[in-house]
Every structure is written in structure tokens, then in C-alpha cells.
Amino acid sequence: MTLFLTSSPSGCPFEPGPDIPVLDTRNHFVANLRAVWPDHAVLGLAIAADPYAYEQNDEMCRVFAQSFANAHLPLTALIPCDARNAEEIGSLLPQSGFVMLCGGHVPTQNHFFAQLGLPGLFHNYHGIVLGVSAGSMNAAHIVYAAPEEPGEAADPHYSRWLNGLGLTETRILPHYQFIRDHVLDGQKVEDIALADSKKRHFLALPDGSYILCADGSEALYGKGWYFADGMMEEINEDEDVLPLR
């Protein structure tokens, strides 16, 4: 498979934007998608973060189907995978040339992915996978589920490390340019991340940066920060490409 791990494919989701999101052309994102896209329209499957947010999942598919059409990345349809059709995942996934791992609450999505049996199902998948925010986080073998909802940072029972899909060993923290100075439960998000990096390392990405995984190699496109051992370092600049493995 070809795996794109994005913070967001269409700019910062927390800032005002057009009704139909425009796919980000920074760091060759759209160009790299087009380079691997088949020369015909493919079925798209958007695997939800919240399996019961039916209206939200339908609307997300509607707007992103148009986004991909506007970027000349043709889909026959973009259908949501949530609680309504979860039992069909075994047949839906092999039919889909494109899979979107949607954004949302990381632990909620992680639980849904496990219910679907996705880690095993992806072993034989050879299409294009696009992770978006939480979806990119849950693609990792061991996920860094950074606290994001009020109460999570202060909860000693909140699990910050989860078993993910195993599509990559790279853990990401998305929307970093937006969240780094936020305060959660009295702690700055950046300070929470630095403390957590003493246990396991991860990459913080701003919107517009992404990791491309293909043919056994991975590369960071755009700016990123490496967190490890309680420290962080900016390791790449916009429009630069850094091989990771």
C-alpha cells in the first residue's frame, strides 16, 4: 500500500475555510497523490472516528468527495464506514482503491478500528491509504494518544499509548502549530508532549506536512519536530524532504 500520514489534507481544520475543503498543494501533497492514483476512478472508503456520528460522517464524505474531484483525483464514490455497515468491512475494504482514516477522538477511533479487525484486514490491502489527524495517529503500531479532551491530561487512568493498525512505526502528533500553546487541565500541550516523549519518541507535524510511506521507505515532507527523551528538535523545513527510513 501507499500510506499518507497527514495532520490535515486541507489546511488547519480549526480555522475558517471554504465549504468544500481544498486539498493542500504544499510540500507536493497533491502531486504525490496524483503520482500514485490509478488512471481511473476508484471506490473510496472513509473509516470513521466516531462510528455513531452518522450525520457528521455523511457530511464529511460529501465534502471530501468534492474536494478530491476538484483536485482531479477521481472517485466513483466516497462511502463512510461506521456502525451502519461495520459488518461489511471484510468486503468493502478489498473493493476500495482508496481508504481514508478519518479525524476525530483518537481513543474512540482506536476502539472502533479494533472492533472492525482492521489491523489484520490491512495485511492484504494494496491501495492508497490517507490518514487524517487521529487516523494518522492510529495508523502506528504503538499509538501516542495525546490527551486532548478536558480531564484527560489530569486523569491517571487515561491511556496515552495504544495498540494501533501497525501500518507504520512512526507516531505523529498533528496540528502542532495550532495546539502547541494550548493549555489542557492546567498544563501546556507542549509540556505534556515533552514529558510523554521520555517514554516513547514521536514526530509533531503542523498542518501542511505529512509522511509518505511506500515500498518500505518513509519520508517526511515539510516541517516537523522530533520529540524524544523529554526534548524536541525541529528536523525539517517546509518544501524539504527528509528520509526517515
Segments the model singles out, each with a brief description of its role:
Residues M1-P38, A48, Y54-D58, A145, ...:
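C-terminal and late-domain segments of enzyme folds
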Residues F4-L5, F98-C102, L130-G131, R171-L173:
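Structural motif
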Residues L45-T108:
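Portal/gating segments that form or line small-molecule/metal binding sites
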Residues L92-Q95, Q115-G127:
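Catalytic-core regions built around general acid/base machinery
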Residues L101-C102, N124-I142:
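Catalytic nucleophile loop
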Residues G104-V106, G135, Q177:
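Short glycine-rich anion-binding loops that position phosphate/pyrophosphate groups of nucleotides
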Residues V106-Q115, H182:
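Glycine/threonine-rich flexible loop motifs
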